[in-house]
């Protein structure tokens, strides 16, 4: 990434293809594309949850990746109709005037400990008045992630997410689009946990790897466990 690239353009930076997003977040194959770009089934088009309209590009921007990661935290997403989820995202986008509302910190801070409400007419639903339990719950479920993500500032001072932990269980393994081509790395390091796990699998001593790469033995184990959990490489090391 160019040194003069703004945080805003970072959110618009094309970083991944859909299959990579599924793998990095741990989603079933095809999920990221459905959420981000919509899908067609039985001759019927289903609009995206996250994009305003479907696009022809095979690429996913950093802002879209962050939003997909946040949506993956929504515990009721299998119960709540897609139309309600999409409406909640649309309302957040309009209310905060943000292209990627789930990639900015302001919506998470603005709705903390209070309801976000909207009228049914605003989102095209028959309810006379809808409390956005969907939007509120989505923000609530993902708030832990927003609270520990690394923020940056855009040119107007908005706080946006520039680095995310890959998993609550592995807080020291992070994803940043400006480091290691957006692939997982350790905080403050440029080595991939997958590379570390593969070297252990290849017979390298953990103590030697820890010394060579400035990692703790716990981080070495985290690399192995993370790589196994997300099926990022074939491993036999325990």
UniProtKB/Swiss-Prot annotation:
The cross-references to InterPro entries, in alphabetical order and at most eight, read: DUF433, Homeodomain-like_sf, VapB45-like, WH-like_DNA-bd_sf
What Pfam family is a match for this entry? DUF433
Source domain of life is Bacteria
Designated name of the protein: Uncharacterized protein Rv2308
Q: Which organism is it from?
A: Mycobacterium tuberculosis (strain ATCC 25618 / H37Rv)
């Amino acid at each position: 990434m160019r040194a003069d690239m703004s945080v805003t353009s970072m959110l618009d930076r094309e970083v991944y293809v859909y299959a990579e997003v599924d793998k990095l977040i741990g989603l079933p194959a095809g999920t990221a594309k459905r959420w981000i770009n919509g899908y067609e089934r039985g001759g019927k088009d289903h609009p995206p949850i996250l994009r305003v309209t479907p696009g022809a590009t095979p690429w996913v921007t950093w802002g879209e990746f962050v939003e997909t990661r946040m949506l993956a935290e929504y515990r009721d997403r299998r119960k709540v109709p897609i139309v309600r989820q999409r409406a909640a995202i649309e309302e957040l986008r309009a209310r905060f005037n943000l292209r990627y509302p789930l990639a900015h910190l302001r919506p998470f801070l603005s709705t903390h400990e209070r309801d976000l409400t909207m009228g049914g007419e605003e989102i095209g639903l028959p309810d006379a008045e809808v409390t956005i339990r969907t939007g509120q719950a989505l923000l609530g479920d993902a708030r832990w992630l927003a609270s520990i993500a690394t923020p940056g500032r855009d040119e107007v001072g908005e706080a946006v997410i520039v680095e995310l932990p890959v998993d609550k269980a592995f807080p020291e393994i992070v994803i940043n689009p400006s480091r290691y081509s957006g692939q997982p790395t350790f905080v403050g390091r440029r080595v991939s946990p997958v590379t570390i796990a593969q070297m252990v699998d290849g017979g390298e001593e953990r103590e030697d790897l820890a010394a060579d790469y400035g990692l703790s033995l716990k981080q070495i184990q985290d690399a192995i466990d993370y790589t196994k959990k997300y099926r990022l490489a074939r491993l036999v090391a325990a």
